[in-house]
């Protein structure tokens, strides 16, 4: 993740590499946040700039980097990773919409209980076509954005769609 070191007013990337492809995609994604934070500084009181713009830069960086996948990983792996990028984009759009709808419904409830929150999530989880597993109704708890940045998740959805349009444009020009 990328954060701001407010004492220095500088962005900083925190990454725990594990030797996989995700080291590359992680640093590329976070570098998009870094550039955004560097160009449009955030502050301790008001936080980050527009989330959709931050995510557009990060997801955009990921897709721009696919141009070098073959050189970095070889042709077979490059194709697989490109397909993985597109698959993750579909997931970003679906999850972004689902989590936004989830939070809208949660915040609209009058007498909310933790059981009701889990029920709402379970309903939406199934409605969005996800595979049910033991404990899926509590999956929302493991998403930090639900607590520290409510309604952030729609940013992934809103950023992915124009980025895919730009990526398509890059491929034809």
Name these PLM-found stretches:
Residues 1-173:
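Cation-handling catalytic/transport regions enriched in His/Asp/Glu
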């Amino acid at each position: 993740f990328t954060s701001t070191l407010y004492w220095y007013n500088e962005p900083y990337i925190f990454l725990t590499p594990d030797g996989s492809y995700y080291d590359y995609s992680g640093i590329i994604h976070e570098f998009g946040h870094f550039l955004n934070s560097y160009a449009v500084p955030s502050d301790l009181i008001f936080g980050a700039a527009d989330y959709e713009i931050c995510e557009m830069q990060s997801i955009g960086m990921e897709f721009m980097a696919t141009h070098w996948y073959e050189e970095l990983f070889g042709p077979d792996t490059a194709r697989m990773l490109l397909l993985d990028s597109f698959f993750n984009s579909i997931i970003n759009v679906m999850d972004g919409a689902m989590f936004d709808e989830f939070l809208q419904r949660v915040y609209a409830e009058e007498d909310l209980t933790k059981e009701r929150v889990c029920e709402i999530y379970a309903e939406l989880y199934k409605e969005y076509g996800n595979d049910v597993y033991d404990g899926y109704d509590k999956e929302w708890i493991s998403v930090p954005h639900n607590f520290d940045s409510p309604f952030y998740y729609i940013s992934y959805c809103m950023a992915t769609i124009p980025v895919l349009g730009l990526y398509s444009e890059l491929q034809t020009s």
